[in-house]
Amino acid sequence: MLFRKRKPKSDDEVITFDELTRFPMTFYKTIGEDLYSDRDPNVIRRYLLRFYLVLGFLNFNAYVVGEIAYFIVHIMSTTTLLEATAVAPCIGFSFMADFKQFGLTVNRKRLVRLLDDLKEIFPLDLEAQRKYNVSFYRKHMNRVMTLFTILCMTYTSSFSFYPAIKSTIKYYLMGSEIFERNYGFHILFPYDAETDLTVYWFSYWGLAHCAYVAGVSYVCVDLLLIATITQLTMHFNFIANDLEAYEGGDHTDEENIKYLHNLVVYHARALDLSEEVNNIFSFLILWNFIAASLVICFAGFQITASNVEDIVLYFIFFSASLVQVFVVCYYGDEMISSSSRIGHSAFNQNWLPCSTKYKRILQFIIARSQKPASIRPPTFPPISFNTFMKVISMSYQFFALLRTTYYG
């Protein structure tokens, strides 16, 4: 089985690095994406996965073209503006999924190198993992990943399967004379996609697979971001805790200087890795926030102007988009706060009995921590909770403009 139910590990068992990235890696493979495909000795499996991925995205983008065509046709008139705005958030979601997959493909080798570097500094034995509190970070990360994934995939699943479930219940259980052949997304097909039952189901399941591909590619890039930031946060917090607890008076000056030298090297490497995370993900997050602002706006507009059935569907969509932005901002804020802690810990440790040279090195550590590790999308401030409020503000401005246009 792809997702086997695993027995939860106790705090007395060693956690491997691969366990922290297994969920996004395995989930990604369900659409054919394997980050480590170049290391797969099975050439046939490698090319089959690649073919499945390309085929899935060709199918996905063919339906996106149909959505765009539907939007263009209906945006021309105020009488069909509601129908146009109904498909707009789906188009925005699709563009985000496409752009994230494109960004991952471009930065694949850099991302693999980043994961390899994180694996090199990952604590391996049980005693070290207890000091790093690896078990806590793994549990917290898995909870966030699970809830985030369920919410986002609920959106795509509800839009995909609701029309078929509704039609089936009405036809077989409620005695409806016809089986309504509707689709979960508004699409302008270049052929008659409803008259012939075979064509309808072929198109319907093609659309369902398209939604699944979009959902997985949309979610998994964020899951990889969560996995990398979680580990960097773990390293920064370990440095801060270890630095604050260090008693310089119990060691010789030579031992103190050696300790600080090793810690500075370790800190510098963690900062370099955080900068690489910024280089890989910052532009993706910029587009993500811009598109999310529009998606939240259009989904919110549909909630205020649609019938009860659509309100439920778009509320799920609205919630998933909000949570996605919040999760990214939360982990960006965690990176900033954990790396900033190092300076406070350096100041709070018992440095009074130490030498002048030791104190001078501490000053450099404190000065470096004034510029914390962060993710900095172009034109945006470093990602934090303040960024979340900025995205919400942008969404509301678009929403107010749209309501003014629609209601006059």
From Swiss-Prot:
InterPro entries, per database record: 7tm6_olfct_rcpt (IPR004117)
Record membrane topology: Multi-pass membrane protein
Segments on the Extracellular side according to the record's topology features: 74, 166-209, 302-310, 400-408
A GO molecular function held by the record: odorant binding
TM regions (residue ranges): 53-73, 75-95, 145-165, 210-230, 277-301, 311-331, 379-399
Cytoplasmic topological intervals: 1-52, 96-144, 231-276, 332-378
Record function comment: Odorant receptor which mediates acceptance or avoidance behavior, depending on its substrates. The odorant receptor repertoire encodes a large collection of odor stimuli that vary widely in identity, intensity, and duration. May form a complex with Orco to form odorant-sensing units, providing sensitive and prolonged odorant signaling and calcium permeability.
Quaternary context: Interacts with Orco. Complexes exist early in the endomembrane system in olfactory sensory neurons (OSNs), coupling these complexes to the conserved ciliary trafficking pathway.
Comment field (misc): The atypical heteromeric and topological design of the odorant receptors appears to be an insect-specific solution for odor recognition, making the OR/Orco complex an attractive target for the development of highly selective insect repellents to disrupt olfactory-mediated host-seeking behaviors of insect disease vectors. Odor-evoked OR currents are independent of known G-protein-coupled second messenger pathways.
Sequence similarity: Belongs to the insect chemoreceptor superfamily. Heteromeric odorant receptor channel (TC 1.A.69) family. Or49a subfamily.
Protein name: Putative odorant receptor 92a
Record organism: Drosophila melanogaster
Lineage: Eukaryota, Metazoa, Ecdysozoa, Arthropoda, Hexapoda
